[in-house]
Regions:
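Active-site helix of classical SDR
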Residues: 105, 141, 149
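Substrate-binding pocket helix/loop in short-chain dehydrogenase/reductase
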Residues: 81-82, 89-94, 184
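Short C-terminal tail/terminal secondary-structure segment
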Residues: 130, 204, 215-230
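Conserved NAD(P)H cofactor-binding loop of Rossmann-fold oxidoreductase domains
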Residues: 73-79, 224
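Alpha-helical segment proximal to the catalytic Tyr-Lys
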Residues: 110, 154-155, 212
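Short-chain dehydrogenase/reductase
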Residues: 1-64, 77-80
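Short, small/polar-rich loop/turn modules that mediate ligand/substrate recognition or access, typified
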Residues: 157, 162, 214-216
Length: 230
């Protein structure tokens, strides 16, 4: 997404939690290096820390002088079937995926100048398209994002700010083992995985002036993927 937005002329700030990003061990998973490559502003942040989301928005405003667009694609997700749920894991999902987004949007709204168009793009998942019985805490947190997207869109529309959420579907970022990769691929009608670039194209469009009349929407960018496909 950062590559696409930079290519399309946006001035971009990237953030991440270095300790967590390093644990994931995914290819291309170093946002600081990516920021340096793209000439973007890199500002690490812990969105679970007190004041973390507010400080992140303040850093963007200080660096750029204003903040027009917020793309919030951070997430926390673990395997949480019914028999393995515990309060700590539920709280972690809600803190990262719900509370942090609420505070980011609140801080954005406070910092966004009157009379300037604005864009907020949040990320959800496919929980409304079929059961996610092995990811109960994650599914609950992403369902909250869909609800909040609609409320935020109503609250911010008078100020010219659109708010939408994307369900990117399964993206081939290196996380899936070979068996999972094959199972998921067969459930895409096109028999290929989605890619980060597929999602990035939609993000960039939603951030553009052309999407000024699109708000309060939950948009599936998932290539028709369904667990029911075979």
């Amino acid at each position: 997404m950062a590559r696409r937005l930079t290519t399309d002329g946006y001035r971009v700030m990237l953030t991440g939690l270095p300790s967590y990003d390093a644990e994931q061990g995914l290819p291309g998973g170093d946002p600081a290096a990516l920021a340096a490559e793209l000439g973007a502003f890199w500002h690490p942040a812990d969105l679970t820390a007190p004041g973390g989301p507010e400080a992140l928005v303040a850093a963007a405003v200080e660096h750029f002088g204003a903040l027009d667009t917020l793309v919030s694609c951070h997430t926390y997700s673990t395997h949480t079937p019914l028999g393995e749920l515990d309060s700590a894991e539920i709280d972690r999902h809600l803190t990262v995926n719900v509370r942090a987004n609420m505070l980011l949007v609140q801080a954005y709204a406070a910092a966004h100048g009157e009379g300037r168009p604005g864009r907020i793009v949040l990320f959800t998942s496919g929980q409304r398209l079929g059961p996610m019985t092995g990811e109960l805490a994650y599914a609950a947190s992403k369902a909250a994002i869909e609800y909040l997207t609609r409320d935020f869109s109503v609250l911010l529309a008078p100020r010219g700010v659109t708010v939408n959420a994307i369900n990117p579907g399964p993206n081939d970022t290196g996380w899936a083992d070979p068996e999972t990769h094959a199972w998921v691929r067969e459930r895409f009608p096109a028999k290929r995985w989605g890619t980060p670039d597929d999602t990035a194209k939609l993000v960039s469009w939603l951030c553009s002036a052309e999407a000024g009349w699109i708000t309060g929407q939950i948009i599936d960018s998932a290539g028709g993927w369904s667990r029911d496909n075979a």
